[in-house]
């Protein structure tokens, strides 16, 4: 016998002992070494226990680590992440931890695979041990049968020799009687012969006593051997108990697999949480869009309010302008009055008080008007007084005038002639002088105009350069302003977001701490509940195992009873033979038994008493046997139901496995598709990184350009500073303009208004040009007239010379008029000065542009410091709003000034004399033309800039639209992907529900098994009762035969009353034989009492089983209730986890939005290309889907074929069961028949022995076939496992973690589905269990052969022990290769 090491310490005991053990790298290395040693050594049981301990330590370490990690991360990471670490660092750490966890999971899975291989080896050793035990038992049974046969032979030989001797003695007695009648003389010879016969009988008695002693010694030896065998059986029972403990450990391993399924459930819950995260993100985006729409509506309201205010402001401006217009008209009228008074002021009353003109440009217009009104009132008073004096003088003058009139009339007539001549001469002289002056002034004007043109050209060049720079700087300013505004908005949002996040994080931390404390308490309670549940489950499992043990013991006792019954039958046969011999002896010794009738009657009475006792015992025994038979019938019915249930479950399992394989294939395809998408995302991420690098390069290039621009601007500043030496006063005004950052916008508005004014001036200039053309025609006509007049007046010159002297006085007056004309030229000089001032203003604008460039550099620096000055910027924004309002006021003031300038220009045109109109018109035409040219150029540039800006705006709108469309497409794709994920999650949930249903079905199956075992006990008891009834009937027949023979013997004894002394010796022998029979009857009675006690024990055990069954049902109901409570608590924990994950999502969203805003601009062109590629991929995927549909149809056809095969096998099994039942019926018929005759009985015994040998041979053949089937199943399973190991090695080389996890899951599912750990519970059962294993073997072969497409005959051809060993070596090498690849 092979005795394994102590295997009493189960998997659960190590879990209870090693809860406080920490794990290090050394333990993992020790675990690897122990696995390698186990692969090399077959009987290293200590190392197997060490592996179990290390696995428990790993599980405990992972649980403790996960709890600590969750608690620590919830409390620590949220508080410290803002202080020290960035999001990217945390993300990298999380990725590293995930990689470590994945590596540990792979190592654990490899260890589990190795353990499964070790358990397979162990199971093989156990099978070999069990086979050897069966062989030993069979040998032992054969030895028992042989010993019984050997014992029967010498007894029969001795009996035959005794019969021969008795027959010879009977013949001799008959001869002696004849001689006694004939010859009385021969008495002496008879006495001598009789003495010799006595001596011979004594020798026979001594020999018979020796043989009895030898038989007793043999019986003692057999009893000793039986005790030894019982001890061995007890040892084997203990081993079976150890194996049951191992089965418990295997069940715990199954619980570990269930825990893995729970982990998969948790992963599904994580996916659900991710879906909820996406939903929350969409909701947040929806809320943000709502907020933006509300802000838009608010801005629209504000704009409408501003528009209304602007309208009101415009109405006020119009009112003010009207008032100013009235005031200006009033001032003009006053000024006209003053001029009139001044012209008529002969005594110069007003020269000291009134100036030449109102200074409208001054700020004190209203004060001047009041002064002028006061002067006018005083002058009017003086005029009234002067008028009174004049009236008095007029009266005196009228008298003198009458006298003078008469004289004047005479002088008038004379003067008329002279005046005509004077006028002509003066006109000619004036024309000559004017022509000379005009020529000189033209030359001077042309020089001045040439110089001004040159200056204007230079100024235009400078202005164009500055405008180009200005436009570029303005464009930059706009970009920077936009960036500033965007940054300010983002910073404000960030502040609000950070504050909100801080509040939410603090609240979340408080809530999470409370929830963690509650969860810890709940976990403690759950752990206590789970420990109680595990203890109760252990007790239930122990009770079930005890039931199974009791069943095995009952079956063994049943076999022992059958063997003892056979032994009793053999003894009964020997007793019958002996009784027949004694009857013959009675016939021979009838004459000797007459004296012993009294003794025989007394002994017959004793026998009758014994028979009554035996009948009572038999009745009790019959009742017990009937109960046992009832139990046996019920047990048979339960077994049949169980077989039918198992067959249906196998069918369902077969179909579910096929469907599961199909779903696994679909999952693999979806996983591959997901990996492709991940690969594409990684590719996009790499491209984005490249684009970011290019952006950085371009930014550096732009910075270099900005530096060059700064250098150029510094050079320009140095050149301009040289020019600014003479313009120190204007620099003071620049300091005011520096603070006004939005002057450029105001200038544009002013330019638009100036354009309108210029258009008006252009219209006026066109009118003036028409007037100048008319005047030029008049001048030519006058020139012609002058030439004609000159010819006529040459003759009259002589006469004019005389009149020259009289005209000198008039020339003096003309000089005064010329002085007045010179005053008008001074006014022209003032206009030229204004032009120069405008040029200076342009220069100041140029300087402002340079300063703005400097300010841009300052702004760039400020942008880097804006994170620390966010609150100050808010205040600045408020100040900017006030400044904008001030600028608007200044713009309005400037508009008023422009209107005043327009009115002044109109007044200047009125005040000019007719003589200077030609000069002014010419100069104005030239000046206006130049201004128009400048304005047109400026307008063209402005329009070009506007077109450029509009084009840019359109391009930006198009890009934004494209981006929005692309974002929508991406969202659609993400929605599709999420839908697919949801479908996958739903499928996984369906699988989980199916697993739960399967677990409930298993619970129901366990309940049904308990019921079936109860019925099996009843059936066994019924069978036992039936057999005992048959035996009782046989015993009654035997007793009846004995009674009939005794009656015949009594009749014979009455006839033989004349017996001699020879009968005394025979009576002694009979007494000894009767004593021996009494001893045997007492032994049988003791055996019967023992069997009664055993039956009572069985009844008690049955009652205990019923109580345990009730307890198990109650415990199952409690477990169901606790399960529901656990589900509710899991739901609460999931809600808490969701809250934490939503906080993390918000943080992740914020950072993702930042990245997206930067990356969206660059992805536009790339996404267009991707769209085209995706279209192609979609077409390819459609083709693949069509191919997959075809494959699915083919697989469905295969499933139908498999169904037909399964039904055929079921029919075979039914045929086999019918054959078996026929055999049992034949056996019962053979056992039921018995006859009175000895020859027929012996023949039937021989036939029974032959039939028992045939049955034994058949059982032995079935066991060999089972061994071969299990070997073939292992061979096929190892083939499939080697293929999956090849897949794992390839995936490890390619390092695809997701595919590896899928492969490991498949192997675990294959191991659990093949039921390695549950097949060996049924090895010690009867032929029914053999049939179940055979059917399971056939089913597993059929399932595997559907994949490999093999038949049973092909497996028989391929299978051999050498190939099986080769496969084992290959699988071990592949496991070592995987171990090396893992590390």
From Swiss-Prot:
Keywords per UniProt: Coiled coil, Merozoite
Domain of life: Eukaryota
Reported biotechnological use: Possible candidate for an effective malaria vaccine as determined by epitope response in sera.
Annotated coiled-coil segments of the chain: 16-49, 117-324
Biased composition (Basic and acidic residues): 1151-1224, 1233-1249
Spans through the membrane: none
Ranges for region Disordered: 1151-1249
Role noted for this protein: Involved in cytoplasm to vacuole transport (Cvt), pexophagy, mitophagy and nucleophagy. Works as scaffold proteins that recruit ATG proteins to the pre-autophagosome (PAS), the site of vesicle/autophagosome formation.
Family (UniProt): Belongs to the ATG11 family.
Name of the protein in its database record: Putative autophagy-related protein 11
Source organism (scientific name): Plasmodium falciparum (isolate 3D7)
């Amino acid at each position: 016998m092979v005795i394994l090491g102590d295997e009493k310490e189960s998997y659960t005991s190590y879990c209870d002992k090693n809860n406080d053990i920490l794990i290090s790298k050394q333990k993992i290395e020790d675990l690897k070494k122990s696995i390698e040693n186990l692969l090399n050594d077959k009987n290293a049981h200590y190392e197997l226990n060490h592996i179990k301990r290390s696995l428990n330590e790993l599980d405990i370490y992972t649980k403790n680590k996960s709890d600590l990690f969750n608690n620590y991360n919830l409390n620590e990471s949220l508080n410290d992440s803002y202080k020290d670490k960035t999001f990217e660092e945390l993300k990298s750490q999380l990725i590293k931890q995930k990689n470590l966890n994945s590596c540990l999971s792979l190592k654990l899975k490899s260890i589990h695979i190795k353990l499964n291989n070790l358990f397979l080896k162990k199971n093989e050793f156990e099978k070999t041990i069990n086979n050897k035990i069966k062989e030993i038992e069979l040998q032992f049974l054969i030895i028992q049968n042989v010993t019984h046969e050997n014992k029967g032979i010498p007894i029969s030989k001795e009996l035959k020799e005794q019969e021969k001797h008795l027959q010879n003695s009977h013949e001799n007695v008959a001869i002696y009687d004849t001689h006694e009648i004939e010859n009385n003389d021969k008495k002496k010879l008879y006495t001598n012969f009789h003495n010799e016969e006595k001596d011979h009988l004594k020798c026979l008695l001594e020999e018979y006593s020796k043989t009895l002693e030898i038989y007793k010694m043999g019986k003692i030896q057999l009893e000793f051997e039986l005790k030894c065998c019982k001890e061995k059986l007890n040892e084997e029972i203990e081993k079976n108990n150890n194996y049951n403990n191992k089965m418990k450990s295997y069940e715990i391993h199954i619980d570990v697999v269930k825990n893995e399924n729970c982990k998969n459930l948790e992963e599904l819950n994580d996916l659900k949480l991710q879906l909820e995260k996406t939903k929350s993100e969409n909701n947040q985006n929806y809320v943000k869009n709502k907020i933006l729409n509300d802000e838009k509506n608010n801005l629209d309201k504000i704009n409408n309010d501003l528009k209304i205010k602007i309208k009101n402001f415009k109405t006020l401006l119009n009112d003010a302008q009207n008032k100013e217009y009235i005031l200006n008209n009033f001032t003009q009228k006053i000024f006209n009055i003053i001029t009139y008074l001044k012209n008529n002021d002969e005594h110069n009353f007003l020269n000291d008080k009134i100036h030449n003109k109102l200074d409208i440009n001054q700020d004190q217009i209203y004060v001047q008007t009041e002064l002028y009104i006061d002067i006018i009132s005083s002058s009017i008073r003086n005029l009234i007084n002067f008028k009174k004096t004049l009236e008095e003088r007029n009266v005196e003058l009228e008298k003198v005038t009458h006298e003078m009139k008469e004289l004047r009339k005479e002088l008038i007539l004379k003067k008329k002639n002279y005046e005509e001549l004077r006028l002509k001469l003066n006109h000619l002289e004036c024309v000559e002088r004017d022509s000379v002056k005009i020529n000189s002034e033209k030359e001077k004007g042309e020089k001045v105009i040439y110089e001004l043109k040159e200056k204007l050209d230079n100024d235009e060049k400078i202005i164009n350069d500055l405008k180009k720079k200005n436009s570029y700087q303005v464009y930059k300013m706009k970009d920077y302003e936009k960036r500033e505004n965007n940054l300010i908005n983002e910073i404000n949002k960030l502040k609000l977001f950070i504050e909100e996040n801080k509040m939410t994080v603090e609240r979340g931390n408080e809530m999470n701490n409370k929830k963690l404390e509650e969860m810890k308490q709940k976990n403690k309670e759950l752990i206590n509940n789970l420990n109680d549940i595990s203890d109760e489950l252990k007790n239930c499992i122990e009770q079930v195992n005890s039931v199974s043990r009791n069943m095995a013991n009952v079956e063994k006792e049943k076999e022992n009873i059958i063997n003892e019954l056979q032994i009793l039958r053999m003894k009964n046969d020997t007793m019958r033979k002996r009784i027949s011999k004694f009857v013959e002896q009675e016939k021979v010794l009838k004459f000797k038994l007459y004296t012993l009738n009294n003794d025989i009657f007394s002994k017959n009475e004793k026998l009758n008493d014994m028979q009554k006792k035996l009948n009572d015992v038999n009745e009790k025994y019959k009742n017990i046997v009937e109960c046992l038979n009832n139990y046996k019938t019920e047990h048979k019915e339960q077994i049949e139901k169980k077989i039918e249930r198992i067959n249906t479950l196998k069918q369902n399992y077969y179909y579910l496995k096929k469907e599961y394989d199909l779903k696994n294939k679909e999952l693999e395809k979806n996983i591959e598709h997901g990996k492709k998408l991940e690969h594409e995302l990684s590719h996009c991420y790499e491209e984005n990184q490249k684009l970011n690098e290019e952006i950085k390069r371009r930014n550096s290039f732009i910075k270099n350009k900005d530096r060059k621009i700064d250098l150029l601007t510094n050079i320009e500043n140095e050149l301009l500073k040289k020019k600014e030496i003479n313009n120190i006063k204007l620099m003071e005004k620049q300091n005011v303009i520096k603070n006004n950052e939005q002057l450029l916008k105001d200038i544009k508005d002013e330019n638009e208004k100036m354009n309108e004014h210029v258009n008006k001036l252009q219209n006026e200039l066109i009118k003036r040009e028409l007037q100048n053309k008319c005047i030029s025609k008049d001048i030519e006509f006058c020139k012609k007239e002058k030439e004609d007049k000159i010819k006529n007046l040459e003759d009259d010159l002589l006469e004019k010379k005389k009149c020259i002297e009289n005209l000198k006085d008039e020339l003096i007056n003309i000089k005064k008029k010329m002085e007045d004309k010179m005053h008008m030229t001074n006014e022209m000089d003032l206009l030229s000065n204004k032009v120069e001032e405008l040029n200076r203003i342009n220069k100041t604008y140029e300087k402002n542009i340079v300063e703005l460039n400097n300010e841009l550099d300052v702004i760039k620096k400020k942008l880097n410091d804006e994170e620390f000055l966010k609150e100050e910027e808010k205040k600045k924004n408020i100040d900017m709003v006030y400044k904008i309002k001030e600028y608007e006021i200044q713009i309005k003031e400037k508009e008023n000034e422009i209107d005043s300038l327009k009115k002044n220009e109109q007044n200047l045109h009125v005040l000019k004399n007719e003589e200077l109109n030609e000069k002014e018109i010419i100069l104005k035409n030239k000046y206006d033309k130049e201004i128009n040219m400048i304005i047109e150029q400026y307008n063209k540039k402005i329009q070009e800039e506007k077109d450029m800006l509009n084009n840019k705006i359109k391009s930006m709108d198009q890009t934004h639209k494209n981006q929005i469309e692309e974002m929508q497409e991406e969202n659609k794709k993400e929605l599709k992907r999420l839908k697919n994920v949801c479908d996958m999650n739903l499928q996984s949930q369906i699988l989980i529900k199916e697993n739960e249903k399967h677990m409930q079905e298993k619970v129901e199956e366990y309940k049904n098994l308990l019921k079936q075992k109860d019925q099996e006990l009843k059936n066994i008891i019924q069978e036992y009762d039936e057999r005992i009834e048959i035996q009782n009937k046989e015993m009654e027949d035997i007793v009846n035969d004995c009674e009939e023979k005794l009656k015949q013997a009594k009749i014979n004894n009455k006839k033989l009353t004349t017996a001699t002394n020879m009968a005394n010796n025979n009576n002694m022998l009979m007494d000894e034989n009767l004593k021996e029979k009494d001893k045997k009857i007492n032994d049988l009675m003791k055996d019967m009492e023992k069997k009664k006690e055993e039956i009572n024990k069985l009844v008690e055990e049955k009652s205990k089983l019923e109580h345990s069954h009730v307890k198990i049902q109650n415990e199952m109901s409690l477990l169901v209730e606790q399960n529901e409570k656990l589900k509710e608590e899991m739901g609460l924990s999931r809600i808490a986890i969701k809250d934490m994950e939503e906080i993390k999502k918000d943080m992740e969203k914020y950072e993702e939005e930042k990245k997206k805003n930067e990356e969206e601009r660059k992805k536009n062109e790339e996404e267009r290309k991707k769209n085209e590629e995706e279209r192609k991929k979609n077409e390819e995927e459609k083709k693949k889907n069509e191919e997959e549909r075809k494959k699915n149809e083919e697989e469905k056809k295969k499933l139908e074929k498999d169904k037909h095969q399964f039904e055929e096998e079921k029919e075979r099994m039914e045929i086999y069961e019918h054959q078996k039942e026929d055999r049992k019926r034949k056996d019962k018929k053979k056992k039921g028949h018995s006859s009175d005759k000895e020859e027929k009985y012996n023949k039937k015994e021989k036939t029974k022995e032959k039939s028992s040998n045939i049955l034994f041979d058949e059982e032995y053949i079935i066991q060999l076939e089972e061994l071969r089937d299990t070997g073939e199943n292992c061979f096929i399973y190892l083939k499939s496992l080697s293929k999956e190991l090849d897949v794992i090695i390839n995936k490890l080389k390619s390092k695809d973690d997701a595919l590896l996890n899928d492969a490991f899951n498949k192997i675990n599912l294959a191991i659990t589905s093949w039921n390695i750990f549950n097949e060996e519970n049924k090895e010690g059962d009867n032929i029914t269990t053999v049939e179940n294993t055979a059917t399971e073997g056939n089913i597993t072969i059929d399932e595997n052969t559907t994949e490999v497409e093999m038949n049973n005959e092909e497996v028989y051809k391929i299978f051999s022990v050498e190939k099986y060993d080769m496969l084992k070596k290959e699988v071990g090498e592949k496991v070592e290769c995987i171990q090396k690849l893992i590390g």
